[in-house]
C-alpha cells in the first residue's frame, strides 16, 4: 500500500512538473510573439489595436493560423516552422495587414466584406506586399517571408477555382517587391545559403526571368506570374 501511494505521488509530481514546464514554454513563446508583433505595429505607426495569441493544439484536427477581427492567432503547426524572428515577423506582418484592413469595414461593412470575399486573391497580394514593407520598417529581413511561405504553403496545380493565389505567384510578387523596393537585402543576402531560399530559387527560375525581362526592357506592364 505504501509503495502504491509513493508511485501515485511520483506520477502526480512528474505530471505537475511537466505541466509547469509546458506552461513556461508557452509563456516564452507568447512573449516572443508579442514582442515581435508590437514592434511591427509601433515601427509602422499602426494606430489600430491588434492582439496576438499563441495556441498549442494537441488535436488531430488541423487548426489554421490567421487573423480574425483584430486578433491574430498562431498555432504551433505554423510556429514550429519559424526558425528565427524574421520568419515570425513575416507571418505576423501578413496577418497584421489583414487585421488592420478589417478596421475599414466599420465604415461600410457590407461593401468591404463583399469586396474581400469577391476578390480574395487581390487582397492576398495587397497583404503580401504590405507585409514586406512592415517587416523592413520594423528592422527584419523580408526574405524571411519567402522562406516561411516556402515551408508552410504547399503549391497547388492551379488557382483557377481557388480563393488563394498559387504559392509560386505569391513568392514571385514578394520577390519583385523586395527586388525593386529593398534591393539591399538581395545585394547583401544573408539567406543565400539557406536551404529553403535555395529551394525558392530553384522553383522560381521562370518567374524571375519574367521580372528580369521587364526591368531589362523597361516594360511597365504587370507581370502575370505562373
Describe every region a protein language model picked out:
Residues 4-16:
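Sec-dependent N-terminal signal peptides
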Residues 20-23, 70-76, 109-115:
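Acidic/histidine-rich, surface-exposed loop or edge segments in extracytoplasmic proteins
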Residues 21-35, 42-64, 71, 79-81, ...:
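C-terminal capping/extension segments of zinc metalloprotease domains
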Residues 69-70, 87, 105-106:
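Short, glycine/charged-enriched secondary-structure capping and boundary segments
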Residues 74, 86-87, 95:
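Membrane-embedded segments
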Residues 90-106:
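Active-site recognition of the HExxH zinc-binding catalytic motif
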Residues 102-124:
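Post-HEXXH active-site segment of zinc metalloproteases
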